[in-house]
Amino acid sequence: METFAAVGRVFFAAGGRRRLMDAAAYDAWYDTPRGRWIGTAEFRLLSRLLQTQPGNTLLDVGCGTGWFTRRFAEEGLLVTGLDPNPDWLAFARAKDPTAIRWVAGDARSLPFPDRSFDQVVSVAALCFVEDERQAVAEIVRVARQRFAIGWLNRASLLYAQKGQGGGSGAYYGARWHRPDELLDFFSGLPVRRLAVHSAIFLPAGNRVARTMERLLPHTLPWGGLVAISGETE
């Protein structure tokens, strides 16, 4: 199984390849020691950036099998997971049939009114959406307080290993961006206090990787997952 959250997000775009993957196998990867470490590191970063409080409403755009969605629900949030793939949504519903609202939808045209959620998150999903700028605008539109969006980072060791030449394995066809390129997606949008953070500096997941993940500040822009967070105006 490939590294971190992008594996389950690779096929988010309409007509994309995620429909070829097995939802159960992807979700089970997070039960492995390496998968659990990577997923937890990413979740902790995104949760901190969102500044959530119990009882807040949160939308997970491109939720896939709902691994991150369930983690946010465990923190006492009122969570909605959105994904275009009905098979993956069915898997997510089976894992959590009552506490979370699961919605079929497209990131480029979110089926919610303006300012519907206190926070909005997306984890390595927009890298595979044809119009990322439109998807970002939609996330900002439905967020009432804060948002955090994770992308695959071109300025990372993971890119050197998996992203060059069009990408390999689960990363084939993904768009990789440098942090300054991502900030341009927010130009002209009603946002403030944009910040860049990253996680998973050494994707191998061994003891050295875990130690470095604890020691390095997440303000360094070199992790495999780069997150842009901010507030809506």
What are these model-derived regions, one by one?
Residues F4-Q53, G55-G64, W67, R146-G173, N206-R207, L215-L216:
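Conserved class I S-adenosyl-L-methionine
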Residues T65-S109:
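Class I SAM-dependent methyltransferase SAM/SAH-binding core
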Residues V121:
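A conserved beta-strand element that flanks and buttresses the S-adenosyl-L-methionine
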Residues R133-F147:
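A short glycine-rich, Lys/Arg-flanked "PGG" loop and its adjoining helix->strand segment in the class I
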Residues G173-H197:
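Short alpha-helix
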Residues L194-E233:
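A C-terminal cap/extension of S-adenosyl-L-methionine-dependent methyltransferases
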